């Protein structure tokens, strides 16, 4: 079942953020603003630090768009802190790192690999009402390109602010949108 258009389910977890150390995060923290939740398999691994560092490179631009980023793995918040303190790539991360050792959040977002107990590579864009608007899931060996998140967020924000309009493929801010109607069926 697709999670697109569904509200984030209740959860409670411990998180780490540079400068704040440990604190609790719940689904309520994802409401009232745009959020991106980035699931990844494991701390102290190979592709994961490259992805998380890539998200960090886009973090300032995402913040300008009113977006908060949360990364999640089935590691504990303690392991996140240790990784942050020991990895040059992960040490640059300013956004929130949620620990999901109970696998609750990974299971709720349907990214838990039940055989390994690890999260798949999943990216979720969530609107201010806590509703999932976009999902991307990648195989274990395929890292994500965080630069595509900026445009996806802008498109999701545009569609939310302009009911009745949709963003076509390769849409960019200021670009032409579509207004679905019978008049354009078969003419695109």
UniProtKB/Swiss-Prot annotation:
* Cellular compartment(s): Cytoplasm
**Single annotated GO MF:** NADH-dependent peroxiredoxin activity
* Induction, as annotated: Induced significantly under aerobic conditions.
A Pfam match: AhpC-TSA
Q: Which GO terms describe its cellular component?
A: cytosol
Residue ranges of the Thioredoxin domain?
2-158
Output the GO biological process annotations, alphabetical, semicolon-separated. cell redox homeostasis; cellular response to stress; hydrogen peroxide catabolic process; response to oxidative stress
The record places the active site at: 48
Q: Tell me which EC number(s) this protein carries.
A: 1.11.1.26
Q: Which SUPFAM superfamilies match?
A: Thioredoxin-like (SSF52833)
Catalyses which reaction?
Answer: a hydroperoxide + NADH + H(+) = an alcohol + NAD(+) + H2O
Q: Where are the transmembrane segments?
A: none
Per UniProt, the keywords (alphabetical) are: Antioxidant, Cytoplasm, Disulfide bond, Oxidoreductase, Peroxidase, Redox-active center
- What further note is attached to this protein's record? The active site is a conserved redox-active cysteine residue, the peroxidatic cysteine (C(P)), which makes the nucleophilic attack on the peroxide substrate. The peroxide oxidizes the C(P)-SH to cysteine sulfenic acid (C(P)-SOH), which then reacts with another cysteine residue, the resolving cysteine (C(R)), to form a disulfide bridge. The disulfide is subsequently reduced by an appropriate electron donor to complete the catalytic cycle. In this typical 2-Cys peroxiredoxin, C(R) is provided by the other dimeric subunit to form an intersubunit disulfide.
Role summary: Thiol-specific peroxidase that catalyzes the reduction of hydrogen peroxide and organic hydroperoxides to water and alcohols, respectively. Plays a role in cell protection against oxidative stress by detoxifying peroxides.
| PANTHER family registered for this protein in UniProt | ALKYL HYDROPEROXIDE REDUCTASE C (PTHR10681:SF121), THIOREDOXIN PEROXIDASE (PTHR10681)
Q: Which family does it belong to?
A: Belongs to the peroxiredoxin family. AhpC/Prx1 subfamily.
Quaternary structure annotation from Swiss-Prot or TrEMBL: Homodimer; disulfide-linked, upon oxidation. 5 homodimers assemble to form a ring-like decamer.
What is the name of the protein in this document?
Answer: Alkyl hydroperoxide reductase C
């Amino acid at each position: 079942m697709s999670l697109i258009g569904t509200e984030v389910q209740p959860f409670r977890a411990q998180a780490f953020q540079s400068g704040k150390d440990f604190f609790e995060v719940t689904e309520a923290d994802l409401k009232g603003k745009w959020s991106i939740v980035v699931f990844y398999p494991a701390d102290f691994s190979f592709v994961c630090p490259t992805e998380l560092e890539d998200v960090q490179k886009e973090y300032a631009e995402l913040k300008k768009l009113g977006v908060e980023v949360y990364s999640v793995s089935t590691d504990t918040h303690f392991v996140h802190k240790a990784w942050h303190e020991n990895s040059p790539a992960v040490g640059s991360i300013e956004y929130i790192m949620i620990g999901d050792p109970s696998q609750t959040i990974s299971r709720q977002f349907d990214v838990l690999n039940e055989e390994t107990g690890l999260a798949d590579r999943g990216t979720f864009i969530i609107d201010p009402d806590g509703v999932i608007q976009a999902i991307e899931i990648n195989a274990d060996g395929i890292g994500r390109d965080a630069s595509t998140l900026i445009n996806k967020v802008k498109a999701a924000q545009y569609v939310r602010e302009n009911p009745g309009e949709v963003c076509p493929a390769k849409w960019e801010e200021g670009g032409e949108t579509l207004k679905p109607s019978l008049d354009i069926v078969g003419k695109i």
